[in-house]
């Protein structure tokens, strides 16, 4: 199947979240997917930049979908781990094209591996993806709603921070001002309604509430939304290290999906901490936990400071 939209794609790729994020199918065959997403102001962080989290749903859907298209009908598979190693910076506007290929499938063991790439419209490499999927037997409690083809309303994006808001500040002051609402948190954090609550040098805490639009067919939050939250948090932790005029960029992210948060569950707390900071590279660990303190997601990232 080749398509410029999701109308002819498998149901798993026609869910409301893919439609909301503008993810569309370019090519589909068993074990292989090519998807695309337009990027721009809707998905920018507070700096007005496209980051990995801007295409988190795409990053999850592409390798995950390649595995899903490889298993027998009626078999469910979700990602348990996803890693992304970034090359060139994500484009501020334009298109990001992701390809995913199932590289190993062992139904007896109940798992599979997939790899993929992300490129811009000119073919420039943006990221290399690796993922592990596991077979699940949970009922698809929200499938009828999520896969109905309903198009959710696209919210108006929140503003980015102004140039004057960022100029002349060390990064810690920027993140402090973001937490207090003195500067805008940006469209991507606004989409999640991510509320930064605590800020120290090398440490940031925040929370967000699960929302219905985040659901996958199983009734839990789609992994790409969790990628977005973790990437935003890791970036903010990196920014607390920056001097006036210094920039940061996440270079890689490895995320383990430990437990599946329900879309009707309690608020999720997110914490990111720098575990080592050199002159040019910082190593960051982040966790998403539920109200009882159980780990939902753990992630590790490296950031470049320049």
Which sequence ranges carry the predicted segments?
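Non-catalytic linker/capping segments at the edges of enzyme domains
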Residues: 1-42, 140-211
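Hot-dog-fold acyl-thioester-processing enzymes
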Residues: 9, 20, 32-66, 211-235
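Residue-level preference for beta-strand/loop junctions
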Residues: 17, 29-31, 76-78, 94, ...
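Short structured motifs
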Residues: 19-24, 81-86, 190-194, 252-258, ...
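Intrinsic-disorder/low-complexity, polar/charged segments enriched in Ser/Thr/Lys/Arg/Asp/Glu/Gln
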Residues: 32-34, 81, 95-97, 113, ...
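Hydrophobic beta-strand-centered segment that forms part of the acyl-chain substrate-binding groove
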Residues: 64-97, 235-268
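HotDog/MaoC-like acyl-thioester-processing domains
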Residues: 65, 77, 90-93, 103-168, ...
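Structured core of small recognition/catalytic domains
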Residues: 178-260
């Amino acid at each position: 199947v080749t398509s410029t939209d999701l109308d002819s794609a498998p149901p798993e790729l026609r869910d409301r979240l893919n439609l909301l994020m503008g993810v569309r199918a370019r090519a589909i065959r068993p074990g292989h997917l090519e998807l695309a997403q337009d990027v721009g102001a809707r998905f920018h962080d507070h700096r007005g930049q496209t980051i990995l989290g801007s295409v988190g749903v795409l990053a999850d859907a592409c390798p995950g979908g390649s595995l899903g298209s490889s298993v027998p009908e009626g078999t469910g598979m979700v990602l348990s781990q996803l890693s992304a190693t970034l090359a060139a910076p994500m484009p501020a506007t334009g298109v990001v094209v992701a390809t995913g290929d199932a590289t190993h499938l062992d139904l007896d063991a109940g798992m599979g591996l997939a790899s993929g790439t992300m490129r811009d419209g000119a073919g420039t490499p943006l990221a290399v993806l690796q993922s592990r999927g596991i077979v699940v037997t949970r009922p698809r409690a929200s499938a009828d709603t999520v896969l109905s083809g309903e198009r959710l309303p696209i919210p108006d994006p929140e503003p980015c921070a102004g140039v004057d808001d960022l100029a002349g500040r060390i990064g810690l002051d920027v993140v402090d001002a973001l937490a207090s609402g003195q500067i805008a948190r940006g469209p991507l954090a606004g989409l999640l309604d991510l509320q930064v609550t605590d800020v120290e040098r090398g440490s940031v805490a925040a929370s967000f509430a699960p929302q219905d639009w985040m659901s996958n067919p199983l009734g839990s939050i789609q992994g790409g939304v969790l990628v977005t939250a973790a990437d935003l948090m890791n970036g903010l932790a990196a920014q607390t290290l920056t001097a006036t005029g210094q920039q940061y960029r996440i270079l890689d992210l490895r995320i383990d999906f430990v437990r599946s948060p329900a879309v009707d569950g309690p608020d999720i707390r997110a914490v990111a901490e720098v575990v080592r900071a050199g002159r040019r590279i910082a190593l960051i660990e982040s966790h998403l936990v539920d109200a009882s303190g159980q780990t939902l997601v753990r992630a590790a990232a490296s950031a470049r400071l320049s």
